Structure formats: structure tokens, C-alpha cells
Amino acid sequence: MSKFNASRFALVVALLGFLPAGLAAQESNQDSNQDNTGYGTTAAEFLLFGAGARGVALGGAYPAISTDASALYYNPAGAALMSRPSAMVSTYEYVADTRYSWAGVAFPFSGGTTTFGAQIGTLGFGYQPVYTADQPDGTGARYSVNQTFAGLTLASNFSDRFSAGITGKVIADNLGDASGTAFALDFGTNFHASLNNHPIKFAFVLANLGTNIKYSGDALNAGIPRVPLPGEDEVPSLPQPGQFRTKDFPLPTTFRVALAYDLIAAETSRLTMLGDFNQMTSNSAGFSFGSEWASSRLGGSGFGFGLRASYTHAPANNIDLVTNETALDDEERYHGVAVGGGLNYESGNFAIGLDYAFRYMGVLGGTNFFTFSLGW
């Protein structure tokens, strides 16, 4: 085997190496008789839903190659690699008739060495009737749920091979008549070089590092009846005003290491292999791997397309209390298979793109992600 092919083969093995490493970590966790109780202890899980359909189709490994407006979400450092202003809008048909939407815009300046961007994401559903044990047919009242975050990003190229970025964001969680607010930071780096004249990129991302959410509002108000002491006569009185106190909940902080390598890097076509290892506060360590085939200037035109697929693994979260083993092993994966594709057109500084991704959510079924992007 030639030195050239040996290097590329070694890199692909390294990318796929995330697979046994992740499986070993899961087996070690199960062998130590520790169940995965971190899941469900964090608030604002919608922060993990994603941004662009391209990133959703490529799973957790995408931060290594995110260089458009979606980098504001996936890796702030990638925004510094943008060659032109870019805007992106996405909509996600989530489960149980809920919908997640995301939008971002970014502007390079200072000769393209620095980029400033803004993003907003929201998850919610329409008004629903309120049912109680005393009024199972409905109280006549209605409630809604809306979770929103907004962020500002600043990213910069510190050399021709290294960029870094930071995002500050505010998170608002409105659950009917109860609500809470938190603040968080995202940090990201991107190291880009070449191996045997083929691009290679490393990314390190720390996301959702911030304050806890504590809920308050009218939903926590309660009337406390007066209870007489033993031996005392009951004293008629109206319930006294009171309020339940809630525990504060942390955000789903995530640390991610991603690697991407262009196995094929021709003038108008590219095959990229990606791998990722991640650790969330709400779950045990996980990993993902994926690939993307992209072609541009089809037939000498400005049209191009991309095809993507990935698999993201996170330890199952349904633990049998008797055997301490996974109860629904295959169906309880946080993420599974994701596939997608997109069409784009470029002419000079103008670019437009449409992308789609399908992500399997285990027992929750399949979900669809659509994205429209514009560059100028």
C-alpha cells in the first residue's frame, strides 16, 4: 500500500474508531452497575434539536464542517470561515404535533477575518384545553407551551488554520402559567489543514454552559387550607395564599469533539467522512459518524447537490430497575439513523439552497427537517 493510501486509510479507521470507543464506554457504564439517571434532569432540551437540515442529516459530527449560517448553532468558530453574508431558516416537524423553528443570519467583516451573527430558535404548540381530576371533561381554560432561545455570535480567524468563536444566548421557557429564564454561552474552535492535499478539520465545542432555570408564575400559586390542631374546633376560613417552590434545573451542557476528512476532493465533487465523540450532562458519552457526497457546477452550470447520511448513538435511557439493563435497547436511542440531501445554486456572490433531513427518533418515530438558505 502506498504512503498516500495508507495515510487516508488510517484516517478513515480513526473516524470509525469512535464506534468501538463509544460502545466500550457504554459497556463500562453498564458493568459498573450505574444506571443512566442524568436523562430527564435538565431543562430546555429543545436546545439540542439542531439548526440546518444539513447538520441534522450529518448528526453530531457536523460541527467540523459547518461554515454557513448554521455554524452559529453548531460551532461558532465555523462562522469565521464564511466567505459571504448568509441567512438560513429551518422548520422541524417534531413529534406530537409540535414544531421547532430556527433562523440565523451572519455577516463577515474586517476583510473576512471576523464574523458577527444572530440566531433564534423556538419550540411550541398551540393552545390546549386544561383537564383536571375534578373536571375530566375540561375546565374551560386553555394553556400553551413555548420555549425560545436567542443568541449573538462573534467569531474570528486567528491564523490561516485556526478559528474560534463564542455565542451568548438567553433561554426563555414558558410552560402554561409557569416560566423560567436562563443565560448560556457556547464556545467553539476549528482547526483546518490538509493531509495528502485533502482537507481535514478538527472541532471542539462546548455548548449550553450557563445558569439554571427556576420556574415561577401563577401556575405555582396554591390555596392552603387552615388545619386545626388536634382537639380544636374547626374554624371556617378561606384558604390562605401560598406558592409552591420549585427546584432549579440545569441546561443540557454538551462537550463535543468532531473530525472531518475529505476522502475524495476533486474540483467539482467531494466525499467527506465525519466522526464525533460527545458528552452531555443529561446522558452518558455518545458518538456519531457520517458521510456527505457533494457535487457542484453540474454540466458547467451553477447547480449542485449533496447527499448525506449518519448514525448517532447515545446510551439508552430506559433502565430496568430489576436487572439494571436497557429495557428497550434499540428503540430508546436518543438519536439514530439520519439521512438527507439538498440542492443549491451559485452565481458569483449569490447562492441559494434547499435542504431536507429525516431523523429517526426511536419510539417517537421519524421526523422531518426543512431548510432554506441564502447567501449574497
Region locations from a protein language model:
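Short strand-turn segments of transmembrane beta-barrel domains in outer membranes
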Residues: 60-63, 85-94, 357-359
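Cleavable N-terminal export/targeting peptides
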Residues: 1-41
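Outer-membrane beta-barrel porins/channels
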Residues: 26-55, 99-100, 104-376
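N-terminal periplasmic accessory domains that precede
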Residues: 70-78
